[in-house]
A protein has these predicted regions:
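N-terminal alpha-helical interaction blocks
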Residues: 1-87
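Short, flexible helical or helix-coil boundary motifs
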Residues: 14-15, 52-55, 68-76, 95, ...
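Short, flexible, mixed-charge glycine/proline-rich loop motifs
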Residues: 86-99, 111-117
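The −1 position to Zn-ligating cysteines in a subset of zinc-ribbon hairpins
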Residues: 99-102, 121-124
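Cys/His-coordinated zinc-binding microdomains
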Residues: 104-107, 126-129
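Short cysteine/histidine-rich zinc-coordinating motifs and their immediately flanking basic loops
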Residues: 112-120, 134-141
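Long, charge-rich boundary regions
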Residues: 130-169
Length: 169
């Protein structure tokens, strides 16, 4: 079982007892807390994407927006704050759920008269099941790609730190 799955399982566990002989659910929760000390945005992103906890969405969006402002300044882009906020929000939404809204990630069109799929590929995503980032943002694709990569990097750092904490625990 991977680190993400183990942490997700620990978060819904009813048994938070400590066991000195083996790793228990509480150890994985501790590890995520330790990992959050070095990578707090990674924990926010984990909660948003994998734990489906949208309570920190506004705070996460503010963080993504501030990253976008800094990078846009370094790239010397002339973009309004409203457009930059929209780009940050669309990039975050795409990062959290990149699946095609038309086919719900299945890649095929649904029959309108029955709860089943047709053999025709989805016209929105061309059978991929997910939409490319270009479809989520209107302009400044390079900035959006950088933001998505930064989100992946923060998430990866958080997972690696949590995994290391459980291995050395």
């Amino acid at each position: 079982m991977g680190a993400l799955e183990r942490l997700a399982e620990a978060q819904i566990s009813s048994d938070l007892s400590d066991n000195s002989m083996r790793l228990s659910d509480v150890d994985y929760l501790r590890a995520s807390g330790w990992a959050a000390q070095t990578c707090p945005e990674g924990l926010m992103l984990y909660r948003l994407k994998y734990a489906n906890d949208h309570r920190e969405y506004a705070q996460t969006l503010r963080r993504v927006y501030s990253l976008a402002v800094g990078k846009a300044f370094r790239m010397r882009l002339t973009i309004s704050h409203q457009d930059l906020h929209e780009l940050a929000e669309n990039t975050l939404r795409h990062w959290v759920a990149p699946i095609c809204p038309s086919c719900l990630g299945r890649g095929y069109e649904k029959r309108p008269d029955a709860p089943m799929l047709t053999d025709k590929e989805c016209s929105h995503c061309k059978g991929a099941g997910h939409l490319p980032l270009e479809r989520a943002v209107k302009s400044n694709l390079k900035l959006a790609e950088w933001l998505a990569l930064k989100l992946d990097s923060s998430m990866g750092a958080f997972i690696a730190s949590a995994r290391n904490a459980t291995e050395t625990y």
